[in-house]
Amino acid sequence: MKIQLVAVGTKMPKWVEEGYKEYSRRFPKDMPLELVEITAGKRGKNADIARILQKEGEAMLAAVPKGNRIVTLDIPGKRWDTEQLAEQLEAWKLDARDVSILIGGPEGLAPACKAAADQSWSLSPLTLPHPLVRVVMAESLYRAWSITANHPYHRE
C-alpha cells in the first residue's frame, strides 16, 4: 500500500522539507509515503476565495490516482489517537487500495474534495499551520506503522 499526501502549497521552509523527509525515508518499501504538492492559488485583498478553493480542489483530485481511498484532513473529521491510527492503517492495508490524504490550504478544502472523501480525519481541534501539518502527518503515520510492525519507535 502506498500513502500519498496531497497538500496545497509549494516552496516550504527548509525545516519543513527536512522534517518531512526524515520520516518519509523511514517508511518500508512496501508502504512508501509520497508527497504531491499542489500550487496554491494567488490570494490577495480582492481574491475570489471560493474560486481559488475550487481550482485547488480540482488539482488535488486530479492528483489522486483512480481507485485510491481518499481521506481528508478536516477539523470536523473523526479524531484518532495513535493506536486508533494504527488500526486505521491496518484496515487500509486490508482494503487493498492505496491511500491519498488531502491537506488543504489556508482556507481548508474545496467542497468537491470533502464530497469525494471516503473518510475525514481531524488531526487536531487546533488550527495548525499547513507546513507543520506535513511534518506531523509524516511522523504520525510512521509512528502508526511502527505499532503495526512491532517496531521499537513507539513507546507507551
Curated annotation (Swiss-Prot):
**GO CC annotations?**
cytoplasm
What this protein catalyses is:
pseudouridine(1915) in 23S rRNA + S-adenosyl-L-methionine = N(3)-methylpseudouridine(1915) in 23S rRNA + S-adenosyl-L-homocysteine + H(+)
A Pfam family matched in the record = SPOUT_MTase
Q: What is its EC number?
A: 2.1.1.177
* Domain of life, source organism: Bacteria
Please tell me where this protein is predominantly located: cytoplasm
Which CDD domains does the UniProt record give? RlmH-like
**Keywords (A to Z) from UniProt:** Cytoplasm, Methyltransferase, rRNA processing, S-adenosyl-L-methionine, Transferase
Matching InterPro entries: Alpha/beta_knot_MTases, RlmH-like, tRNA_m1G_MTases_N
**Which terms in the Gene Ontology molecular function aspect does this entry carry?**
rRNA (pseudouridine-N3-)-methyltransferase activity
- Any idea where this protein resides? Cytoplasm
Question: In which family does this protein belong, per the annotation?
Answer: Belongs to the RNA methyltransferase RlmH family.
Record's subunit section: Homodimer.
Job description of the protein: Specifically methylates the pseudouridine at position 1915 (m3Psi1915) in 23S rRNA.
Q: Which PANTHER family match?
A: METHYLTRANSFERASE, RIBOSOMAL RNA LARGE SUBUNIT METHYLTRANSFERASE H
Protein name per the record: Ribosomal RNA large subunit methyltransferase H
Please give the organism. Answer: Aliivibrio fischeri (strain ATCC 700601 / ES114) (Vibrio fischeri)
